Curated annotation (Swiss-Prot):
Tissue distribution: Expressed in pupal wings, at the boundary between vein and intervein territories.
SUPFAM superfamilies: C2 domain (Calcium/lipid-binding domain, CaLB), Hect, E3 ligase catalytic domain, WW domain
EC number, as in UniProt: 2.3.2.26
Catalytic-site annotation from UniProt: 917 (glycyl thioester intermediate)
PROSITE patterns tied to this protein: C2 (PS50004), HECT (PS50237), WW_DOMAIN_1 (PS01159), WW_DOMAIN_2 (PS50020)
Source organism: Drosophila melanogaster (Fruit fly)
Protein name: E3 ubiquitin-protein ligase Su(dx)
Gene: Su(dx)
Pathway, per record: Protein modification; protein ubiquitination
Its job: E3 ubiquitin-protein ligase which accepts ubiquitin from an E2 ubiquitin-conjugating enzyme in the form of a thioester and then directly transfers the ubiquitin to targeted substrates. Down-regulates Notch/N signaling pathway, probably by promoting Notch ubiquitination, endocytosis and degradation. Involved in wing growth and leg joint formation.
Amino acid sequence: MADGNGLPAGAASGGMEAGQTVNGAGSASPTPTSSSGAGASGSANQGYHQLSVTIEEASLRNNGFLKPNPYVELLIDSKSKRKTDLVKNSYLPKWNEEFTVLITPNSTLHFKVLDHSSFRKDAMLGERIINLAHILQHYNGRCEFLELTIDLFVTSKSDNRQTKSGELVAILNGLKLDMSKLQIQPVAGQQNGNPPVQAVNPSVVSDAAAGRSCMIYGGVRARMRLRSSSGNSNGGETRSPLPNGGGDHRRSTQAPPVWEQQQQQSQNQQQPLRMVNGSGAAVPQTAPYPQQPPAPALARPLTQVYGALPENTQPAAVYLPAGGGAAVGPPGVAGPPIEQPGVGLPVSQSTDPQLQTQPADDEPLPAGWEIRLDQYGRRYYVDHNTRSTYWEKPTPLPPGWEIRKDGRGRVYYVDHNTRKTTWQRPNSERLMHFQHWQGQRAHVVSQGNQRYLYSQQQQQPTAVTAQVTQDDEDALGPLPDGWEKKIQSDNRVYFVNHKNRTTQWEDPRTQGQEVSLINEGPLPPGWEIRYTAAGERFFVDHNTRRTTFEDPRPGAPKGAKGVYGVPRAYERSFRWKLSQFRYLCQSNALPSHIKITVTRQTLFEDSYHQIMRLPAYELRRRLYIIFRGEEGLDYGGVSREWFFLLSHEVLNPMYCLFEYANKNNYSLQINPASYVNPDHLQYFKFIGRFIAMALYHGRFIYSGFTMPFYKRMLNKKLTIKDIETIDPEFYNSLIWVKDNNIDECGLELWFSVDFEVLGQIIHHELKENGEKERVTEENKEEYITLMTEWRMTRGIEQQTKTFLEGFNEVVPLEWLKYFDERELELILCGMQDVDVEDWQRNTIYRHYNRNSKQVVWFWQFVRETDNEKRARLLQFVTGTCRVPVGGFAELMGSNGPQRFCIEKVGKETWLPRSHTCFNRLDLPPYKSYDQLVEKLTFAIEETEGFCQE
């Protein structure tokens, strides 16, 4: 008959006499104790008892430059104090010191890990208070070789929060109490923020005794160690320092004794046998994947296997009776009831007499298979057909499966149902679990896709590639040739262009339109709508037999602009073009950086000399701009201001290198009179390099060029329409010649032209002997073409060629092939119009909020000022007066996109400051709106320069 501890009456645990405990070294030493057995009186149980506490090691978090000198202080009921020796300069201290203390069943153990210092008070590295009653309840009053892994916490002085600082390993030993005779005081809640513990069934003792780590309550893990006659109780374990995330990172560097390996490995193989020893019943534990089974060998009797065990360790002998499949312990040893395994052990052709006594199996092994036991008593299966071994019992292959061998003789399995292969032998249970997981995964993915997109009425299951039906055809008409409409599993419609093998969300029939065709008015008489192969809409005028992309209906919208400042119809392609260009720039970037030191007074000359003396490829490195006399650090803001100021200088018409297009157009073009400067070609080469650097590094210039100039950069053919933007009078003259019969007018036009540069008349022949050939009605088209080409290039051929050479040295002109002239202007100059609503929507605040009065006054000031002052304010904060093509949401900082920021800094007497590298405005807490306007206006108009804060 067994008592409450699961031991036979009159027998001591592990074959030792009552009153003996095992110390940390594993040797038996007679230690007097009042808890000598389960038969102790109730009064003795309620009195003081001896407990052996071994402080083994700790793993502390690495959070400083200097390593600590840790030691452990143990307090029992806040009275009795014990200390370990200190370990110098270590985050992984090991003490292995044992203390014998007097405790009651309701005692508290307070573990403190402190950092010793000779010059200051010892600092707390972590602490934890443990209520012994919780452990006794969990382990049915037994603390024998009980390893505790305790999470240590430290309290922050700033916010009084507790954070994990490490782990401590301690061993409790030598305590056995009868829980039925104890009076455990109820605990309202665990200290240090731990939740109250719940009563645990005493049957869990067997689980812990098997060596498994068992969570008692939050942050305290416990397990019963197996007894050892040699070696330290920690089993040669080593610890690595805790990472920031905490957690236990333990690994064994020394193999445990044979009897411990037998105990642990038998758990990993899900062996349906219960091993019973003196410390409790061992329950097998399932491992996800066992080790590779040993090669086939002669099975040894179990008595031979356990013959080498030490005398003080009870072997986990196994008896297989002929009448049942359950394993029982040796005579005289009691244990928990053993469940009958689901499948019996099959009888094989083994010569081992122990295996011959096993019961017959309901499902015999397949032909050529054999069951054996290894030296640790673990079952494995031998396949003599393939000369391989397995831990798992072989079962017939599921329907549709086949076993094969590859060229190297390795066995694999073929699933003809799904046309897949696997190295793992399939069974029905594993396939069922996999199919269940697939179904759950598909359901979760479907629910996640439909959560925020559509209503319940629209969430109907649809095939991923469902074809469009007749019901889907609406008033928009059929899709263009080569297009197809499909539907996703979440009912979202997309369109496939089979000609270029692309997909898109937009309907090609309505792409780029502000409203649908249903709401648009009728076309004028003789007009028709058609679509190109790419799905782009155009209009056919049958009256004049012409086509156009512009809607002829009066008041028809030309298409709303997207976030990139281009029509929405082209926004998708422009975004792709821009990403392709940025990819080319990044993939050809060079490491390190180049320094360019300039002064504000001689900005043009300093920049010219430093850029021209460098090889062109060096200009692709990251720029580090330094203004002499200013201590600013260039994280992007200084270089933005350098590009802004230098572009204002080099494109200044006062230098006679460029000129305005006309009186009403302030776009720039090359000045034909630039030859008055003898070094003008070198300057144009420098400007070409500079403009290419702006494109390459993603910076904006102050002002842009004419559209014909951008077309020359893109190597596009110029037309008569391009003259209209730079010389409207000349354009009107050519149009008159084109539309009228010049033979009747007698204009006396010849294929030659004269023009004046700086008072000098220059004669130019449009073609050979052009001054002798008259323009007639028959050859006037040739005349208009030659005249257009001459007007766009007159006097600037060499300058344009040199400019493009300098540009091509830094950025190959082939990289610009993605863009048209308007897109090139957009990425070079940005957007000049400032959208205040977009600005305010993409602004963040620090120590302010959107309702702070200073913030409200700031936006009032922005709205009341004109565009020029807004641009000055933007240039003051960001380094440039232009807005990126994506709006204020794409303002760039030092490490990528960084939004406009307003931060509360300083006193009301201070001027506003800016951090151009981070797009941040330091706005002091002014007391009135007038004061804010005065200080802000003075800052953006009267100040310049950088400094370090």
